[in-house]
A protein has these predicted regions:
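Mid-chain, well-packed structural core segment of small domains
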Residues: 50-80
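Mature, function-bearing regions of proteins
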Residues: 27, 47-50, 58-61, 105-110
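N-terminal, charge-rich interaction modules
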Residues: 1-47
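Structural alpha-beta junctions
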Residues: 43-57, 93-94
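A general structural signal for short secondary-structure junctions and capping/turn motifs
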Residues: 12-14, 66, 86-89
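A generic "folded-domain core" signal
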Residues: 34, 38, 101-104, 109
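Short, compact, well-ordered microdomains
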Residues: 70-73, 77-105
Length: 110
């Protein structure tokens, strides 16, 4: 578990070349969808990552207050912010998280 503004040394080690990003395809544009719709969107994201041979780890996202549902997500390894932004846009997201090796996690708006 981590927060925006914190460093995550474990992920820095796994993504030492370009950094890493945290991305979900759930609830595009911050609009709540059904579980079924969200799972379809998540599968489309996974298919895209596999087809492009992008390295990733399964992940989940949520807020500490519980006001927003937990979302399936991915941690993309060795990905620059520009490429992560393109993926976020492709999958309808308003924002994603990104960190350069050795730097704090940043919230990146698309």
């Amino acid at each position: 578990r981590f927060r925006v503004g914190e460093r995550v040394p474990e992920l820095d080690t796994l993504a030492a070349e370009k950094g890493w990003a945290w991305l979900s395809a759930f609830n595009p544009g911050s609009q709540l969808l059904s579980e079924s719709e969200n799972l379809q969107r998540h599968q489309a994201l996974l298919n895209n990552l596999v087809n492009t041979q992008r390295a990733f780890l399964p992940a989940a996202s949520g807020d500490d207050t519980g006001q927003w549902p937990v979302e399936h997500a991915v941690c993309l390894l060795n990905i620059d912010e520009i490429t992560a932004r393109a993926l976020a846009i492709r999958h309808g997201q308003a924002a994603f998280l990104h960190a350069q090796p050795g730097e704090a996690v940043r919230l990146c708006w698309v």
